[in-house]
Regions:
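Metal-dependent de-N-acetylase/amidase catalytic core
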Residues: 58-216
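Active-site rim/loop-helix segments in enzyme catalytic domains that contact anionic ligands
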Residues: 1-90, 117-121
Length: 216
């Protein structure tokens, strides 16, 4: 539920994990608002209500070692929970993080492992499995545009500074989601503790728009 997330908005700093343990419940509300913006009514916390996997924090931090975090979960046990959901809803497509969890967050890596194992354990045959990623060419253009306006993209001087950037040759599929950009951006803004409105995400959106957020 994001209990260890970094709070980027000063006005909400009282929710930080270093304060009272209340960020998780606040982020549940953020998620509910994001799902409403996207028109999604069926979303779930893995294992809820009987099992709760806590946010593991960034790689190499102390929360990684807590026994109740997702990073420490038994992969087969967690995968069996997800496999039952797959058997229930019978999806055509499964989408998950890539093998490095996007930017290396332990919970994202674990989500990849659990999703892939669940696809093996479920009785339902999923037609396609996609790993979400960002091609280098798109990110390189984004960095160039940010430099033009005197800003930066998370401090990256070049695309090689971004560990989640994938060589274009490995990107097999591009889905045109241009019609959903407004809903997508509204959903992003719903995560108010995590994204600053004057930060690189929205600066990039203002300068590249559909070019970077319209495609999946």
């Amino acid at each position: 539920r994001g209990e260890e997330g970094e709070v980027l908005v000063p006005a909400l700093s009282h929710l930080a994990s270093t304060e009272k343990d209340q960020l998780g419940s606040h982020r549940e509300t953020e998620l509910a608002n994001a799902m409403k913006a996207l028109g999604i009514t069926d979303y779930r916390f893995l294992g809820a209500p009987s099992t709760k996997f806590r946010d593991s924090g960034m790689m190499g931090t102390e929360p990684n070692n807590r026994p109740d975090v997702f990073w420490q979960a038994d992969v087969d046990a967690a995968s069996n929970i997800l496999a039952k959901i797959i058997d229930e809803i019978k999806p055509q497509i499964l989408i998950t993080y890539d093998e490095i969890g996007g930017y290396g967050h332990p919970d994202h890596i674990q989500a990849h492992r659990v999703a892939m194992r669940a696809s093996e354990l479920s009785t339902w045959e999923i037609q396609k499995i996609y790993w979400n990623t960002m091609p280098k060419s798109v990110l390189a253009e984004g960095i160039a545009k940010m430099k033009e306006i005197g800003s930066d993209f998370f401090g990256a001087e070049s695309v090689d500074d971004l560990p989640f950037a994938k060589d274009d040759e490995f990107v097999t599929t591009l889905i045109d989601g241009g019609a959903y950009v407004d809903a997508k951006m509204a959903a992003m803004k719903a995560h108010e503790t995590q994204i600053s409105l004057d930060g690189p995400f929205f600066a990039l959106s203002n300068n590249l728009g559909l070019q970077i957020w319209g495609d999946e």
